[in-house]
């Protein structure tokens, strides 16, 4: 079975994969795999960008997101007349002819990766560039998104040949068993800048400990007084900052969002 392994922590947001997908499918009809992708309104692969934290402690994550080519694909169950099928290699394909008029296929996807083409009245999505995989004379033998990435964020191949140790899937609660795996998905962080209000100077070398009772992380403020602890679970944390006999204790929640604490006075 084929699938994708996406290294989210390596993605720099250049959108080359997204552009490659557009270049491959806009203006090109790859029947029986897919009709043309509209130039606007559809991104069969999209780099989802999200800002984390609060100013000035902010970072941006980029997560390339194609069709998840699920083993238990809801779109297959929602389709009539076998309009959506799963190939022997694991790729999920929408038959453009059989799927005409079946808008319920779009609504079935829990990932929002199936799009409705108003003009053609068909659902459309990523095909895994099956037309390239099946064509021995094609210039490449992998999906365009894979070929286009300059830093090898996206891998494609047999699942048992990909290094999936520690990999995750999106929305595992859906029970769809996606064949798109991720490493380096963003976890929560707590960050801040420590200073002493008496002389309005930053504190270098302060020890910062973050614990939820079972996990403990430690950092030391740098020459700018900054600390940054990431890889945190969604939880309630006790943050202890200590330096030169002074200590400050904060209770911080990362349940809903990352926390950039801004300037923290150590008194």
For the regions a protein language model found, what residue spans apply to each?
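Short Pro-Gly-centered beta-turn/loop motif in secreted/extracellular proteins
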Residues: 203, 226-238, 244
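Short, ordered, surface-exposed loop/turn motifs in non-cytosolic proteins
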Residues: 188-190, 197-213
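Extracellular beta-sheet/turn segments enriched in Thr/Pro/Gly and aliphatic residues
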Residues: 253-267
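Ordered, amphipathic secondary-structure segments that act as subunit-interaction surfaces
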Residues: 69-79
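Flanking helices and flexible, charged tails adjoining ferredoxin-like Fe-S electron-transfer domains
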Residues: 29-66, 76, 96-196, 267
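A short, solvent-exposed loop/turn motif at the edges and junctions
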Residues: 240-252
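Short, acidic Ser/Thr/Gly-rich low-complexity loop/linker segments typical of extracellular
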Residues: 212-226
């Amino acid at each position: 079975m084929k699938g994708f392994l996406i290294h989210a922590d390596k993605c720099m947001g250049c959108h080359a994969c997204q552009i490659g997908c557009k270049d491959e499918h806009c203006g090109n009809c790859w029947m029986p795999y897919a009709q043309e992708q509209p130039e606007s309104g559809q991104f069969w692969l999209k780099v989802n960008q999200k800002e984390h934290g609060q100013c000035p402690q902010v970072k941006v994550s980029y997560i390339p997101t194609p069709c998840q080519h699920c083993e238990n694909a809801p779109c297959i169950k929602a389709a009539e007349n076998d309009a959506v099928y799963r190939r022997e290699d694991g790729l999920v394909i929408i038959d453009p002819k059989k799927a005409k008029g079946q808008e319920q296929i779009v609504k079935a996807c829990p990932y929002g990766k199936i799009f409705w083409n108003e003009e053609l009245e068909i659902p459309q999505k990523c095909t895994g560039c099956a037309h390239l995989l099946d064509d021995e004379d094609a210039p490449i033998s992998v999906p365009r998104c894979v070929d286009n990435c300059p830093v090898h964020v996206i891998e494609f191949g047999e699942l048992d040949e990909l290094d999936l140790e520690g990999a995750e899937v999106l929305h595992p609660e859906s029970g769809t068993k996606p064949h798109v795996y991720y490493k380096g998905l963003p976890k929560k962080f707590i960050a801040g800048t420590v200073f002493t209000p008496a002389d309005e100077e930053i504190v270098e070398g302060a020890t910062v400990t973050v614990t939820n009772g079972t996990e403990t992380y430690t950092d030391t403020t740098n020459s700018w007084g900054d600390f940054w602890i990431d890889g945190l679970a969604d939880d309630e944390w006790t943050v202890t900052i200590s330096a030169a006999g002074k200590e400050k204790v904060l209770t911080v929640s990362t349940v809903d969002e990352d926390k950039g604490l801004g300037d923290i006075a150590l008194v």
